[in-house]
């Protein structure tokens, strides 16, 4: 699968300057992005005079960057694997050297005009002429980030900054020679990558973007799973998905579910226990599908059952004005007779 993806990306010349690897977990997204970045570095190093080719000063340095939500994660994930990959390549060993550190070594291309670095904020890309970058969107809570919304805004700022630098610096004859790789597993419907892709597609500006979004059973080798499958009905914000019972897995019933607005998946039977045990997690991790509100502390299903036109708002004012030194409490603005 990934060989075909890489062929699709690079056989189109410089058509794609933004590449997004999303979908299920544990399918090789980061490793593929690293392989693509190594190839981008190889192409850049094969130019006789990269600075002259792109019309830059002789002293200009081009950058290969690795970004994550924190600098420690940026250094410890893709950046580390990238350097480990180059370490076993005879070609890269013949055309560059590695730093002397045994544990934290990094690659130094010959000529000293190409820099390989990592970062986590837009400021880490300032003043750099970024030729290629991997943005690996990790789990915010695992990274110790409490303000998720602020982290997403920071990530969008970083993404836009790097994308602008790639397109502005390495555009020639109407083509962008650099690439930005964004790697992210599905988590929730309001994730940074999920929202960004949707906005690009809705605005009709997605021609320059390549998106790989597949479930595990379409990416991993066929022999990994059983050939027998089962049906999963995928809902939306208003309809909760479920595993279709075996005694209802006939054509007419599946067609009726499609008519009701459900999407139908056919995972291998090996995955049935995971979907039955925790449907939302299996849908996210195995199928690479995020359901609106499914992973919140309060699910959309529990909210929907409480919606009614009979109840009235117990607060007469939408905004409560309570000063720091007031003796008023929120309860005093609550009119319980509205809901009784």
Regions found by a protein language model. Name each.
Residues 1-340:
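Phosphate/NTP-binding elements of NTP-utilizing enzymes
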């Amino acid at each position: 699968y990934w060989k075909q993806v890489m062929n699709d990306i690079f056989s189109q010349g410089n058509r794609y300057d933004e590449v997004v690897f999303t979908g299920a977990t544990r399918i090789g997204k980061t490793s593929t992005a690293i392989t693509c970045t190594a190839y981008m570095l190889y192409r850049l190093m094969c130019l006789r005079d990269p600075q002259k080719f792109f019309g830059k000063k002789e002293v200009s340095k081009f950058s290969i960057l690795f970004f994550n939500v924190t600098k420690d994660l940026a250094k410890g994930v893709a950046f580390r694997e990238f350097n480990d990959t180059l370490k076993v390549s005879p070609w890269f060993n013949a055309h560059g050297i590695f730093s002397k550190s045994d544990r934290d070594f990094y690659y130094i291309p010959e000529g000293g005009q190409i820099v390989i670095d990592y970062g986590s904020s837009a400021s880490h890309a300032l003043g750099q002429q970024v030729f290629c970058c991997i943005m690996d969107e990790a789990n915010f809570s695992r990274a110790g980030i409490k303000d998720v919304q602020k982290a997403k805004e920071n990530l969008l700022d970083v993404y836009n900054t790097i994308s602008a630098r790639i397109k502005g610096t390495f555009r020639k004859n109407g083509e962008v020679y650099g690439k930005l790789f964004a790697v992210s597993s599905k988590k929730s419907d309001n994730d940074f990558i999920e929202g960004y892709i949707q906005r690009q597609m809705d605005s009709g500006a997605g021609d320059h973007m390549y998106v790989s979004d597949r479930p595990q059973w379409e990416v991993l080798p066929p022999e990994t799973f059983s050939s027998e499958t089962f049906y999963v009905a995928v809902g939306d914000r208003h309809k909760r998905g479920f595993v279709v019972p075996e005694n209802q897995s006939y054509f007419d019933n599946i067609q009726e579910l499609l008519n009701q607005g459900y999407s139908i998946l056919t995972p291998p039977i090996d995955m049935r226990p995971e979907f039955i045990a925790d449907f939302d997690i299996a849908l996210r991790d195995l199928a690479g599908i995020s359901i609106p509100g499914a992973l919140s502390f309060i699910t959309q299903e529990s909210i929907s059952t409480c919606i009614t036109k009979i109840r009235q708002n117990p607060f007469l004012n939408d905004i409560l004005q309570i000063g720091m030194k007031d003796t008023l409490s929120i309860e005093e603005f609550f009119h319980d007779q509205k809901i009784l």
